[in-house]
């Protein structure tokens, strides 16, 4: 169902269990030409790798309050957090928007560009109702692959980059440090 109530059958192109993202497709020939021309706008993907992203005003649309059609307005408060997943790491954009633990949707900058996909469960334990999002820059490649119906390569490793501090204090060599290997991974 589109925002104006128009309904159409959709098919699942691909889904990513790690991020909870899915790409669904609607056959264009099933939609009215006027509807396509006047009511559909393609979202522009921006960048979440902005140097001074903290303090950036944002609008959260979709389900940031846990109900369809809700929205919130605030700023990015931090982009220092990361979420390690199998074979990748996602940047987490934290906001000061009070939302729901069942939040979902999209985070836009004031130019109307998508800069994040809202996720739940990535907030600090003492800030569970603050809206957080995966940075869009890290997701662009995944979205493109899912849109093309491509599967993800999967090795089953969770790792981090070795920092200068870890190298000097712990003697860990520079490079990738494997924190975890998923059971039954290749």
Whereabouts are the PLM-identified features?
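Conserved active-site neighborhood of the chymotrypsin/trypsin-like protease fold
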Residues: 1-62, 66-67, 101, 153
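Residue-level recognition of short loop/turn positions
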Residues: 4, 110-111, 186
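C-terminal cap/linker of serine protease catalytic domains
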Residues: 10, 110, 114-173
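Short, conserved beta-turn/loop elements at beta-strand boundaries and strand-helix junctions
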Residues: 15-20, 77-86, 162-167
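Flexible, gly/ser-rich surface segments that form the specificity/activation loops bordering the active-site cleft
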Residues: 48-88, 123-126, 145-146, 150
